[in-house]
Amino acid sequence: MIALLLTAAGPALAQGVAFGGMRADTSAPVEVSADNLSVNQSDGSALFTGNVVIGQGEMRLSADEVTVEYAAGGQERIRSLTAVGSVTLVSGEDAAEAGQAVYDVDAGSVVLTGDVLLTQGQNVLSGDRVTVDLASGSAQVQGRVRSVLQPGGN
């Protein structure tokens, strides 16, 4: 089981976290489903609303609404996804909840903000902002960080 590794640098500093299950194949197709879709051809964006679920490999993100921004040149490649409202991100045994998440497809990173809560087995970690590197599975937690770590747990 993956253990949370915290850097004890003080509550005002960013905390390092091993978030190994939160990885995704950033070259895999991104699948989006929702109740409604509005497309804006002029700025290369799409707005999905209502029960939005996004999947890429084993990673799943759900939210109230998601704005998809396409790379320059058309809707062939997604540049970023911005999820707002009841955001949940799940990959393997790792899960995260937040008010907002921004997934930068090219950078392979997800930035979660707004009462972020991470769970890994019975271990829980919360903070103001979490940046997850999907290639390495590492994360940085910033703001007032609180954690509950179970001895002998995962």
Regions found by a protein language model. Name each.
Residues 1-154:
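Mature-chain termini and adjacent capping regions
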